[in-house]
């Protein structure tokens, strides 16, 4: 019995032991436990946290907020450790705004086992310290988008394990050190947008290189033929430098190369493709903006893999070789700004994969071959600034993919016979300006419902503007300037309209300005100059918060420009030209108080809206966008000037040639950023407001042909940018400000103000007015007045002498009796009065 119990107990013990044995198996055969972060690594990171304090506007994506002693540093955000040794091997602080410099003593360089270091977008300043050479295990280094300066430290050569360097967008300069030759494992080198200079770049030893990007620096040497030894090179980008010499054809011998960008340098001479074989992998070749010349060699056909060929902005001449038809993979061909001539070769139209074709700014002529219709994949076509003639190519109307067309500055004279229209829903961007197009705008144009941009300006079009265009709600820019269009203006701005720019200037339009424009909430530019529009001032346009340019010049607008119940000001206005109309009335003193854009310092916008793709893109210095910029005609400095681009900071007011009266509003002085002010040819009265002296950037001021009086404010003489002044034909008086700006004006700028003086140096003897304000009790006399006064004195002299003799005789003969009688009578009166 006892033996059985013992056996039972022993069995239980064995069973339990076996159970625990099974539980221990996973740990027994598992890999060793991951080591915790080493204390020296943790302490170095905590010191680094103190060196890189958290900035108030720093990114919350990666921060050091999680870095504290209570947590294993290998689990900290941005930190990666070696699982076995507990050493920090990767540090990623992208967009951690440090606003500090890297010092040689930084605890960062105590992390000697780092393999991956990423400190981009950290606002790091100062130089790269030589201590960077201590991180000899680094394979990946990214310090891009900071504010680093100075030269590469020579110690960079110690990082012989480096495979990737990215220093994009800093201010590093000087030569690349020769120690760079030690980086034999380097695969990618990104130095774009710095200030590196110098001659030969020692890269030939770096045979592992696959990507070299030296763009946007100041390198000024030839491209060394030793680079042909880089047999793994795939992308070579050196645009925007000062590299010179012949085209480096040896690059084409590198069999692995797929992308070459040499644009915006100083390469010169003919281009040749050496002994390039048909096995070339090159897909992109960009040599634009250089000084290359001569003919394009037939051997270009050997680059059979080419997809993008950019030869624009050089001096190539002759005809495009027919062998180009062998480049069947081309989707982009850019030959603009050269001297190519003759007819467009039909070989181009065999490139059926072409999506982008740019032949602009050449000497191509004749009719565009109908075979262009074979380019069924074409989405953008630019034939502008050539000598093409005849009718517009039919493929433009028929294509279902062609959304961007520029045929401007040619001699096309007809829209052609339209047999078929393409996809009506495709958003289009057409520029047919500056041709010889005749007749009315065809009604079928309205079948294309989506136009982002349509430019028919500077042609010979007549008839009325198709009313159906008002249904094209996706219009952003419409330019019909300088034609012979007549009739009424359509209601372009129906509900939901995207119209942002409308130019119908220099036509024969009549009627009123459509009040539907109030629905154009995106309107920025409106130009109706030089028509026959008869209407009152559109005060209601003040509700358009983006309206920047308003030109009503040379129409028959009439009446006041101010209504107390409706006036809102023009807060976004930069250019207003309402000259040569029939506007009347006075302006209230606070008229310009709400023109806030005129008093704001203009800054180039970081981003702007791409209306076609509905995305944000880098801002432009000019009104409009990068593809289509607004233009304008203005009387500037007394000369009718055509501005093909409108600088964003260009701010102008022209109210000239009307019948405004009353005082010039004092609030004009609030427009501190105004550059050009023209109030001439009106009936303004009163003094010139001294507040004008507050417009410190004013360049031109024309107040001529008014009824202004008083003195010219002395403060105007301190406006250092004022270069063109006209105060002529007013009633001004007093001393003209004695300043360089006033002294450099023509005498005619002050004529018609006879009481102005201080013009001796300007006008010489032709106009020296009376300085009335110096000695008003003793006015200076003109020579003719002096002669007349002497004649008057001579005439009065004879009678004066006769009267004097008679009075003298009476006085001497009867003086005793007369004096006694007079004196005694007065004395008696005094005595009686005091008694």
Swiss-Prot record:
Gene3D superfamilies according to UniProt: Ribonuclease Inhibitor
Pfam families documented for this protein: LRR_1, LRR_14, LRR_8, LRRNT_2
Disulphide bridges: none
Membrane topology recorded in Swiss-Prot or TrEMBL: Single-pass type I membrane protein
Keywords, in A-Z order: Cell membrane, Glycoprotein, Leucine-rich repeat, Membrane, Receptor, Repeat, Signal, Transmembrane, Transmembrane helix
Extracellular side: 31-790
Sugar attachment sites: 57, 68, 99, 134, 182, 205, 220, 275, 377, 462, 471, 482, 594, 678, 707, 726, 746
Subcellular location: Cell membrane
Topological domain spans for side Cytoplasmic: 812-835
SUPFAM superfamilies: L domain-like, RNI-like
Transmembrane spans: 791-811
Major location category of this protein: membrane
Superkingdom of origin organism: Eukaryota
LRR repeats: 111-135, 137-159, 160-182, 183-208, 210-230, 231-254, 255-278, 279-302, 303-327, 328-351, 353-375, 376-399, 401-423, 425-448, 449-472, 474-496, 497-520, 522-546, 547-568, 570-594, 647-671, 672-695, 696-719, 721-744
A GO CC term attached to the entry: plasma membrane
Signal peptide start and end residues: 1-30
InterPro entries cross-referenced by the UniProt entry: Leu-rich_rpt (IPR001611), Leu-rich_rpt_typical-subtyp (IPR003591), LRR_dom_sf (IPR032675), LRR_N_plant-typ (IPR013210), LRR_R13L4/SHOC2-like (IPR055414)
PANTHER family xrefs: LEUCINE-RICH REPEAT-CONTAINING N-TERMINAL PLANT-TYPE DOMAIN-CONTAINING PROTEIN, UNNAMED PRODUCT
Family, per entry: Belongs to the RLP family.
Protein name: Receptor-like protein 37
Organism of origin: Arabidopsis thaliana
């Amino acid at each position: 019995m006892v033996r059985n119990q013992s056996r039972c107990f022993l069995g239980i013990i064995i069973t339990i032991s076996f159970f625990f044995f099974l539980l221990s198996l996973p740990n027994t055969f598992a890999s060793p436990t991951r080591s915790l972060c080493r204390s020296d690594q943790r302490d170095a990171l905590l010191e680094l946290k103190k060196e890189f304090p958290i900035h108030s506007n720093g990114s919350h994506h990666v921060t050091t907020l999680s870095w504290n002693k209570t947590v294993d540093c290998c689990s900290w955000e941005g930190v990666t450790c070696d699982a076995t040794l507990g050493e920090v091997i990767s540090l990623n602080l992208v967009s951690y705004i440090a606003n500090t410099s890297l010092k040689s003593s930084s605890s960062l360089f105590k992390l000697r086992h780092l393999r991956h270091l990423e400190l981009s977008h950290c606002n790091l300043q100062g130089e790269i310290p030589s201590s960077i050479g201590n991180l000899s295990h680094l394979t990946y280094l990214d310090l891009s988008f900071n504010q680093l300066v100075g030269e590469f430290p020579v110690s960079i050569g110690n990082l012989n394990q480096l495979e990737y360097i990215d220093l994009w967008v800093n201010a590093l300069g000087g030569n690349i050190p020769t120690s760079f030759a030690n980086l034999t494992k380097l695969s990618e080198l990104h130095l774009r947008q710095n200030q590196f200079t110098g001659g030969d770049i020692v890269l030939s030893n770096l045979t592992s290189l696959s990507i070299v990007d030296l763009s946007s620096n100041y390198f000024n040497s030839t491209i060394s033929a030793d680079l042909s030894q880089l047999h793994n090179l795939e992308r070579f980008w050196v645009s925007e430098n000062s590299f010179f010499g012949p085209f480096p054809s040896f690059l084409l011998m590198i069999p692995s190369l797929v992308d070459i960008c040499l644009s915006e340098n100083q390469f010169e001479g003919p281009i040749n493709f050496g002994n390039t074989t048909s096995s070339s992998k090159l897909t992109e070749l960009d040599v634009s903006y250089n000084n290359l010349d001569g003919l394009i060699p037939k051997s270009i056909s050997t680059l059979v893999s080419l997809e993008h060929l950019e030869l624009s902005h050089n001096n190539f001449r002759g005809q495009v070789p027919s062998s180009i038809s062998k480049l069947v993979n081309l989707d982009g061909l850019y030959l603009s700004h050269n001297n190519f001539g003759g007819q467009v070769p039909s070989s181009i139209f065999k490139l059926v994969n072409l999506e982008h074709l740019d032949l602009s700014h050449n000497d191509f002529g004749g009719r565009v071959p109908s075979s262009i219709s074979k380019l069924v994949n074409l989405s953008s076509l630019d034939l502008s600034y050539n000598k093409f003639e005849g009718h517009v190519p039919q493929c433009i109307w028929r294509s279902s993919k062609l959304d961007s067309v520029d045929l401007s500055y040619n001699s096309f004279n007809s829209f052609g016979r339209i047999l078929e229209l393409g996809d009506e829903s495709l958003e289009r961007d057409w520029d047919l300006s500056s041709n010889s197009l005749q007749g009315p705008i065809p009604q079928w144009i309205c079948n294309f419902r989506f136009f982002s941009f349509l430019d028919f300006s500077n042609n010979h079009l007549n008839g009325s503007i198709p009313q159906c265009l008002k249904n094209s709600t996706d219009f952003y820019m419409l330019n019909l300037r300088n034609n012979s269009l007549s009739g009424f203006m359509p209601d372009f701005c129906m509900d939901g309209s995207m119209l942002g720019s409308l130019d119908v200037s220099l036509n024969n339009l009549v009627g009123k300005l459509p009040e539907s424009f109030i629905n154009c909430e995106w309107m920025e530019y409106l130009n109706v100059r030089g028509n026959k529009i008869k209407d009152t001032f559109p005060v209601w346009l003040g509700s358009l918060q983006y309206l920047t340019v308003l030109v009503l010049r040379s129409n028959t607008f009439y009446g006041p420009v101010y209504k107390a119940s409706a006036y809102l000001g023009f807060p976004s206005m930069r250019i207003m030209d309402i000259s040569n109309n029939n506007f009347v009335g006075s302006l209230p003193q606070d008229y310009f108080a709400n023109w806030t854009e005129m008093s704001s310092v203009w800054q180039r916008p970081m981003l702007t809206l791409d209306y076609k793709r509905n995305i944000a893109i880098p801002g432009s210095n000019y009104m409009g966008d990068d593809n289509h910029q607004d233009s304008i005609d203005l009387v500037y400095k007394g000369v009718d000037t055509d501005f093909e681009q409108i600088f964003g900071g260009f701010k102008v007011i022209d109210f000239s040639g009307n019948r405004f009266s009353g005082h010039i509003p004092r609030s004009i002085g609030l427009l501190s950023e105004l550059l050009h002010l023209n109030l001439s040819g009106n009936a303004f009265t009163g003094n010139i407001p001294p507040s004008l002296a507050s417009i410190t950037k004013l360049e031109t001021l024309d107040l001529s042909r008014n009824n202004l009086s008083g003195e010219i404010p002395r403060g105007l003489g301190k406006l250092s940018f004022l270069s063109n002044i006209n105060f002529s034909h007013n009633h001004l008086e007093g001393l003209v400000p004695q300043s360089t700006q006033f002294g450099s004006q023509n005498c005619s700028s002050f004529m018609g103000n006879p009481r102005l003086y201080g013009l001796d140096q300007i006008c010489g003897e032709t106009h020296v007015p009376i300085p009335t304000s110096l000695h008003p009790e003793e006015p200076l006399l003109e020579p003719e007045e002096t002669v007349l006064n002497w004649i008057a004195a001579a005439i009065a002299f004879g009678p004066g002498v006769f009267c004097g003799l008679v009075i003298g005789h009476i006085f001497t003969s009867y003086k005793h009796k007369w004096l006694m009688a007079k004196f005694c009578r007065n004395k008696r009166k005094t005595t009686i009065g005091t008694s």
